[in-house]
UniProtKB/Swiss-Prot annotation:
Similarity section: Belongs to the CbiM family.
Chain segments annotated as transmembrane: 8-28, 41-61, 75-95, 108-128, 136-156, 176-196
Main location: membrane
Function in brief: Part of the energy-coupling factor (ECF) transporter complex CbiMNOQ involved in cobalt import.
Pathway: Cofactor biosynthesis; adenosylcobalamin biosynthesis
Keywords attached to this entry: Cell membrane, Cobalamin biosynthesis, Cobalt, Cobalt transport, Ion transport, Membrane, Transmembrane, Transmembrane helix, Transport
Localisation per UniProt entry: Cell membrane
GO annotation, cellular component aspect: ATP-binding cassette (ABC) transporter complex
PANTHER family assigned: COBALT TRANSPORT PROTEIN CBIM (PTHR43627:SF1), PTHR43627
Organism: Methanocorpusculum labreanum (strain ATCC 43576 / DSM 4855 / Z)
Protein name, UniProt field: Putative cobalt transport protein CbiM 2
Stored NCBIfam families: cbiM, PRK08319.1
Subunit structure: Forms an energy-coupling factor (ECF) transporter complex composed of an ATP-binding protein (A component, CbiO), a transmembrane protein (T component, CbiQ) and 2 possible substrate-capture proteins (S components, CbiM and CbiN) of unknown stoichimetry.
Disulfide bonds: none
């Protein structure tokens, strides 16, 4: 989904950067506050950031000017919410643009909005909704959350490209074309990413449940159940 350097007109680059900025700025404040309150969250936060970096670096060529890959943001969205995830995603995208030529600096705002903001926000809403029912375990909830974050990211990227490159004057036709091409790779990738994130989440519950409990992600009863499965 990383839109490459120079692929978007400067006006759209500025638009997406301005739109993304408030989310990231608030996310920095929220992240700083959380760390000041309890520094024990730092290792898990770092793991989530590294997870985003590694998964989103596994790119597969796709639409001209972009690519397909997992996003890794669903896990962070589930654990820390969308604002902190927007900061982690921005850091990852900046490093990838500078060190891996993956994405770009002029298109950073557009890539941040799709992968670090839109995907995590919708995914977080899904996660919260599923968990509030009291009937969906953390493994299944994280699986769905990760898959949704992936698919929403590419839906937004399709829209971003369609706004700039309409097909026969039609943004809708362009959106359908871009989304259709992305779907070939992203649907399987979203499922795989969901499985990986679910396994990682359950592993963290087994080895470091107190952090997730403090974050309000999981309660003692479910912790005991998951840890019992590992015996």
């Amino acid at each position: 989904m990383h839109i490459m350097e120079g692929y978007l007109p400067i006006g759209w680059c500025i638009f997406w950067a301005v739109l993304s900025a408030p989310f990231v700025i608030y996310g920095i404040w929220k992240m700083t506050k959380m760390i000041q309150e309890d520094r024990r969250v730092l290792p898990l936060m770092a793991v989530c950031g590294a997870f985003v970096f590694v998964l989103s670096a596994l790119k597969i060529p796709s639409v001209t000017g972009s690519c397909s890959h997992p996003t890794g943001t669903g896990l962070s969205a589930a654990f820390f919410g969308p604002f902190i995830t927007s900061v982690l995603g921005t850091i990852v995208l900046l490093f990838q643009a500078l060190l891996l030529a993956h994405g770009g600096l002029t298109t950073l705002g557009a890539n941040v909005f799709s992968m670090a903001i839109a995907g995590p926000f919708i995914a977080w809403l899904v996660f919260v909704g599923l968990r509030k029912t009291g009937k969906v375990g953390i493994g299944v909830a994280v699986f769905i959350t990760a898959a949704v974050a992936n698919l929403v990211t590419y839906t937004v990227t399709s829209l971003q490209l369609a706004l700039v490159f309409p097909v026969e004057g039609s943004i809708l036709n362009a959106f359908i074309a871009f989304a259709g091409i992305f779907a070939v790779t992203q649907i399987p990738l979203a499922i795989i990413e969901g499985i990986i994130c679910a396994l990682v989440a359950k592993y963290i519950v087994r080895v470091k449940p107190e952090i997730l409990k403090k974050l309000g992600i999981i309660q003692d009863e479910e912790i005991a159940k998951i840890q019992g499965e590992a015996v």
